[in-house]
Amino acid sequence: MFRFTTAGESHGPALVAIVEGLPAGLPIDVEQINHELWRRQQGYGRGARMKIEQDRVEIMSGVRHGLALGSPLALMIENKDWENWNAVMAVEPTELAPEKSRRVKRPRPGHADLAGGLKYDARDLRNVLERASARETAARVACGALAKQLLESFGAQIRSHVIQLGGVPAKPLELKFEQIAAIPEEAPLNCGDGEAQREMMELIDQKKAAGDTLGGIFEVVARGVTPGLGSHTSWDQKLDGRLAQAIMSIHAVKAVAIGAGLEASSLPGSEVHDEISYNDETKEFIRDTNRAGGLEGGVTNGEEIRVRGHLKPISTLRRALRSVDIDTKQEERAAFERSDITVVPAAGVIGEAMVALVLAEAMREKFGGDSLGEMKRNFEGYREQLRGY
């Protein structure tokens, strides 16, 4: 079993998470978690909140002397902005003057504001947007960093890159894993095409001046994942379905593609399916192409897993769209909350975390074990089985 849950509001005192299922003896590198949190905050076009928050994780339980205990791991990420919101977000009953309450009553089109308000009968839409905020993904990235550390113990690596922002595509769209890993961390948009990246930045500047926002496409690539994770036997065990749900759960993602994705629907089968051959030296079945994106029948096939997330533009616009005041029912401009112009590079980092969490769950299902040593013995036994197939 492997699972995680997060809690916390955008302007509350902290984000917290609990991760269950890490095997005892797994080395836990706190600075690696902090580095992933730093990566999430980078990217040209981010808002002022990123200048306030300097995310650092504090592990509260489940680790001793740098090793996982096998018990639930609890972690916390403080919200530095809490000091500016402690009255508005107080736990205790508090009477605030209307001008200080920061009540939200003009829902933003495209956001959870109105749908959440209707569902939970919230007359202050702040009760919805505080949890619906993408700030929650900081906790997911921390959990994903732990999942990455587990996967790395078994030779798997995960990276992401931006392949399109607005209407500007990178060229080529598909990079080798080594090329993606070689993109400098200081690259403003985590894009492997320098010329396209400059065009993207110019477009961001234009939309910022116009009070608008931008979406785009990121790709997550996982290398070194063993064949046989997931299952063809039941719909909810198919790994491609689980990965798609995980990526779709990221704020603003409206479509997910695996491998050739949407393009495959317009091509003949002879140009889509990856022909199989056998390597006598490595004792492995291999493919010269990877249009399946590393998954066939809901099961990993040993090739790189390639998943793309398509993001809509952020729903908080400085040039606000038309909306309705939920009190008066009169037409108004939507509320404005401090926000970004685009988050595609950060969404890629979050995508890495979600892919890592799904793969870690699949690894624990497949290989079990209470300790890392036991899990590795099970893994090696399976690898020996594959070599004899």
Language-model features and meaning:
Residues M1-Y389:
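Generic N-terminal targeting/processing segments that precede catalytic cores or assembly contacts
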